[in-house]
Amino acid sequence: MKSSIIRFSVSLPQNLLETLDERLTHKGYSSRSEIVRDMIREKLNEEIWSSGAENTQGVAVLTIIYDHHQRELNQRMIDIQHTSTHKGNVEILCNTHVHLDQHNCLETIILRGNGVHIEDLSIEIGGLKGVKFSKLTRASRFE
C-alpha cells in the first residue's frame, strides 16, 4: 500500500539551507523534498539499529578485507557464518569474494535477521586475526 504524501514546512537558518542546497546539487537530487526524505530515513534507520532492541529485524552488508594467508582464517569465518545461520539468528543472503592482490581478499556478506545478532556476527568476524578491515553497513530496515 502506497502512503500519501503530506506537506509540512520547516524553518532553517539561512546558512543551513544553503548547505542543504549545495548537497542537493552535488548529489543530484531533484528537489529539497527528496533529500530531506532520504536524510530522515537514514537518521531513523540509524536510531532503530542503535537502539539494540532484541526484536529489531534488518538487512546489512558486512565488508571485510583480510589476509588470505592467515592460517585457518577462511575456515573460522565460514564456521561463524554457519553457526549463526543454524541458530536461526541471521540469514546469509549472499557472499561475494574478490581477490585484491597476492595477499588480500575482499568479501561482502549480505545479512538479514535480528539486528543484535547481525551486529554480533560482524564483531566476531571483524575481530579475527588477519582481518584488516571490517565495516557493517546497515542497508535497510523493515518491520
Swiss-Prot record:
GO terms for molecular function: DNA binding; DNA-binding transcription factor activity; nickel cation binding. Binds 1 nickel ion per subunit. CDD domains: RHH_NikR_HicB-like. It comes from the Bacteria. It holds the Pfam family RHH_1. Keywords: DNA-binding, Metal-binding, Nickel, Transcription, Transcription regulation. Ni(2+) binds at H82, H97, H99, C105. Disulfide bonds: none annotated. Its cofactor is Ni(2+). InterPro entries: Acetolactate_synth/TF_NikR_C, ACT-like_dom_sf, Arc_rbn_hlx_hlx, CopG, CopG/NikR_regulator, Ni_resp_reg_NikR, Ribbon_hlx_hlx, TF_NikR_Ni-bd_C. The keyword Repeat does not apply. GO terms for biological process: response to nickel cation. Belongs to the transcriptional regulatory CopG/NikR family. HAMAP family: NikR. Transcriptional regulator. This is Putative nickel-responsive regulator. It comes from Helicobacter hepaticus (strain ATCC 51449 / 3B1).
